[in-house]
Amino acid sequence: MSKVLYIKANAKPEGVSRTFKISDSFIEEYRNQKPNDEIITLDLYKEGISFLTEEAIKLHVPKQGEGKDHHVLKYAYQFAEADKYVIAAPFWNLSFPAILKAYIDYICVTGITFKYTEEGAVGLCQGKKAVHIVSRGGGYSEGPFEMYEMGDRYLRTIFGFLGITDFTTIVAEKLDVVGEDVEGILRNTIEKAKEQAKEF
């Protein structure tokens, strides 16, 4: 049985968020395929994730005797215990919502999700897999605007730093481009997400 961490990073609610329409369809199909797996949903906005403060940074190093419910380290422990990750985050201002970066600052903890050796940093989350589900208003997968896409590239890089190299992206884009069949794009992406869920 695998443990799936479903990370949601969008201020828009269910039924409004185009990203969540895709990611929820992915999760539903995954649950149908693997009903015995545990799916933990972490909605970053509902969770109230904040930026690391001076006090939090001081507590950002695990110490002997501190449990997994530690208010600063709990997200890193939760992340490390998962086997698979589904990240649902829209494309905002060439990246993703700032709350997701704040969350990443919580989960990148030496001794929990990575460590330092004489050869450099080594990820402690090896052998796991992740999928990033994203919706974009414009087209950034190819062409002249490809260089402006920094959200998926950053996630792929930071997850690789933590040892997670099996990283897939499911994207619906050009959703705000005049003349595009938006409903058709969403419909096709949802079907693609369901197919990906069967193999995840």
UniProtKB/Swiss-Prot annotation:
Annotated InterPro entries: Flavodoxin_fold, Flavoprotein-like_sf, FMN-dep_NADH:Q_OxRdtase_AzoR1, NADH:quinone_OxRdtase_FMN_depd
Keywords assigned by UniProt, alphabetized: Flavoprotein, FMN, NAD, Oxidoreductase
SUPFAM superfamilies noted in UniProt: Flavoproteins (SSF52218)
Pfam families: Flavodoxin_2 (PF02525)
Entry's cofactor comment: Binds 1 FMN per subunit.
Molecular function (Gene Ontology), one example: oxidoreductase activity, acting on NAD(P)H, quinone or similar compound as acceptor
Enzyme Commission number: 1.6.5.-, 1.7.1.17
Keyword Lipid biosynthesis on entry: no
Catalytic activity entry: 2 a quinone + NADH + H(+) = 2 a 1,4-benzosemiquinone + NAD(+); N,N-dimethyl-1,4-phenylenediamine + anthranilate + 2 NAD(+) = 2-(4-dimethylaminophenyl)diazenylbenzoate + 2 NADH + 2 H(+)
EC class name: oxidoreductase
Binding site for FMN: S135, R136, G137, G138
Cofactor(s) the protein requires to work: FMN
Stated family: Belongs to the azoreductase type 1 family.
Oligomeric form and interacting partners: Homodimer.
HAMAP family associated with the record: Azoreductase_type1
Its biological purpose: Quinone reductase that provides resistance to thiol-specific stress caused by electrophilic quinones. Also exhibits azoreductase activity. Catalyzes the reductive cleavage of the azo bond in aromatic azo compounds to the corresponding amines.
Protein name: FMN-dependent NADH:quinone oxidoreductase 2
Higher taxonomy: Bacteria, Bacillati, Bacillota, Clostridia, Eubacteriales
Gene expressing this chain: azoR2
